[in-house]
Design a protein with these regions (language model features):
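Conserved N-terminal segment of class I S-adenosyl-L-methionine
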Residues: 1-121, 127-131, 144, 209-213, ...
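Short N-terminal helix/helix-N-cap motif within the alpha/beta-hydrolase-1
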Residues: 90, 138-142, 169
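A short His-aromatic
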Residues: 132-136
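A short glycine-rich, Lys/Arg-flanked "PGG" loop and its adjoining helix->strand segment in the class I
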Residues: 141-153
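Conserved beta-strand signature within the Rossmann-like core of class I S-adenosyl-L-methionine
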Residues: 155-161
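Short, glycine-/aromatic-enriched active-site segment of Class I SAM-dependent methyltransferases
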Residues: 163-185
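Short alpha-helix
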Residues: 186-201
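Short, P/G- and charge-enriched loop/turn segments at secondary-structure junctions
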Residues: 239-247
Length: 262
């Protein structure tokens, strides 16, 4: 790769990374929400809440690493009860406030280090959400085993993680640049690596591994657009989703419904 190509990729990467954080801030600055949140949480896309159809009305659900509660409050409308915990003390108050505002009597959150032992007895949950969290952790297998411990034998794990092998990630790597999609990520995966990590933690997939949206170098610009116009963001997000269905190898990540290994 010549110097000009490397410089172009670097410039696009800078725009991509800054655009995501700009979109989050613009949501608050433009009054779409009184707090900073990613615009993807403000549009109604069925693939965003992909886990909801896998929940049942009588489920007791655990949300591991619930952060601002965006997924938790959505799941609460589907299940009997849900508990979320996280050690992000900046995000948890947002989750608690949303629970109060929406009068979700079946949901609660609390602060806890999710990398340690969970404060729950064995086999007490029928489903667990572990969404875009595993890549931020170091003791990943230990956390998966804790999830397996607190899940019933017939319980379901709804888990997602990032794809490191997309065409854009490979271009960044070839240019000698940091290729992970988030600077806080401790790991990203190929499809096979992700399934191997789940297996090491005691889980096996039920059905196919599902894509998310296209990993495009212009994702950050699209996120920034979302901070300004949710209508345009909606259309661009649908394009990314359709592209990922056509090219699952270039999806931003993987989504898996898993069960405890037998």
């Amino acid at each position: 790769m010549n110097l000009a190509a490397r410089a172009l990729i670097r410039a696009i990467d800078v725009i991509n990374r800054k655009g995501k954080s700009a979109g989050v801030r613009l949501v608050r600055l433009t009054g779409k929400r009184p707090y900073a949140i990613h615009p993807k949480h403000l549009v109604d896309h069925p693939w965003h809440d992909w886990y909801v159809p896998h929940l049942q009305a009588n489920d007791f659900v655990l949300d591991v690493g619930c952060a601002n509660g965006a997924h938790l409050v959505r799941a609460a409308t589907r299940c009997r009860a849900i508990v979320g915990f996280d050690y992000d003390l900046a995000q948890l108050p947002i989750a608690a406030r949303t629970i109060r505002e929406q009068a979700l009597g079946n949901a609660r959150v609390f602060a806890w280090d999710i990398t340690g032992a969970f404060p729950f007895p064995d086999r007490c949950f029928s489903a667990a959400l572990f969404l875009d969290v595993i890549e931020h952790l170091h003791p990943r297998v230990a956390v998966l085993r804790e999830i397996a411990r607190v899940l019933r034998d017939d319980g379901r794990l709804l888990v997602s993680g990032p794809n490191r092998a997309t065409r854009w990630r490979r271009r960044l790597e070839a240019a000698g640049l940091f290729s992970y999609s988030d600077p806080d990520h401790k790991i990203e995966y190929t499809r096979e690596e992700f399934l191997a990590e789940l297996a090491a933690g005691g889980f096996e997939p039920v059905g196919e591994v599902e894509p998310v949206v296209l990993d495009t170098p212009w994702a950050g610009a699209i996120d920034a657009v979302g901070g300004l116009s949710l209508g345009l963001y909606d259309r661009l997000s649908r394009w990314k989703r359709d592209a990922a269905l056509r090219r699952p190898q270039d999806s931003t990540g993987f989504r898996v419904v898993a069960r405890k290994r037998r």
